[in-house]
């Protein structure tokens, strides 16, 4: 019993560990002979090669079921969101205030518009084609170069007086500002049955305000998005796609008064009454022009 409880010295423990690492009597290293180390190494190499192959095969089969031309993630909204340029956000949404006589208050707004429209220059649209059809541009095959689909041109000059080409101030200098409305992209979305969607901007009724109806000039005419820009087939299928735009030039905004402007998309398949998403099918912003 006393022998079992005998404590080993440090040198004895080191000698046992050295003997475990290499036993000259049996030729074992770490408890195994060289041949057994070779066999166990080959076993693990073969095991992990097979496991890696099975994993790669599973990934390959999975990738064959995924359409590379369909986005991995899509919103649950059935109608596209609507965005505005210039976009200046305040504490409670879009708020645009400026003074006609002080160009420092609206220079940044026009700069935002010019920067945004730079992507709609003829040079930026060189890979797109001219479209004149008044119907949807369906493309079942990949007829464009590099296995892609064609995209229709939309250039800034289509916005005419709101293009920044004839009036670099976009109407802000004279108190008749231009605002650009854009619908967000939804893959294979068709906004209407046969008539093109159009933009309609109005003053939003506010208590204690008696406003005359808002007068608007729309560009392109009637504020419509041509149907040949739809459907959108995704970024990989249409890498050069440009969203169509509508510019609204507000003609009779009262000065020194904050008004709320509502611009909504009128189309068969676009809704704008979702209480949970203020930008679905419409955009609302506050505007105050000082003089």
UniProtKB/Swiss-Prot annotation:
It holds the Pfam family Na_K-ATPase. Residues 194-291 are annotated as: immunoglobulin-like. Changing residue 99 to Q: Impairs pump targeting to the plasma membrane. Loss of pump ATPase activity. The gene is ATP4B. It is a single-pass type II membrane protein. It is found in: Apical cell membrane; Cell membrane. The chain crosses the membrane at residues 37-57. NCBIfam families: Na_K_ATPase_bet. PROSITE patterns: ATPASE_NA_K_BETA_1, ATPASE_NA_K_BETA_2. GO terms for cellular component: apical plasma membrane; endoplasmic reticulum; plasma membrane; sodium:potassium-exchanging ATPase complex. It comes from Oryctolagus cuniculus. Belongs to the X(+)/potassium ATPases subunit beta family. GO terms for biological process: cell adhesion; intracellular potassium ion homeostasis; intracellular sodium ion homeostasis; pH reduction; potassium ion import across plasma membrane; regulation of proton transport; sodium ion export across plasma membrane. Changing residue 103 to Q: Loss of pump ATPase activity. Changing residue 193 to Q: Loss of pump ATPase activity. Residues 1-36 are cytoplasmic. Keywords: Cell adhesion, Cell membrane, Disulfide bond, Glycoprotein, Hydrogen ion transport, Ion transport, Membrane, Potassium, Potassium transport, Signal-anchor, Transmembrane, Transmembrane helix, Transport. Residues 58-291 are extracellular. Changing residue 161 to Q: Loss of pump ATPase activity. The keyword Transmembrane helix applies. This is Potassium-transporting ATPase subunit beta. Glycans are attached at residues 99, 103, 130, 146, 161, 193, 222. The beta subunit of the gastric H(+)/K(+) ATPase pump which transports H(+) ions in exchange for K(+) ions across the apical membrane of parietal cells. Plays a structural and regulatory role in the assembly and membrane targeting of a functionally active pump. Within a transport cycle, the transfer of a H(+) ion across the membrane is coupled to ATP hydrolysis and is associated with a transient phosphorylation of the alpha subunit that shifts the pump conformation from inward-facing (E1) to outward-facing state (E2). Gene3D superfamilies: 1.20.5.170, Na, k-atpase alpha subunit.
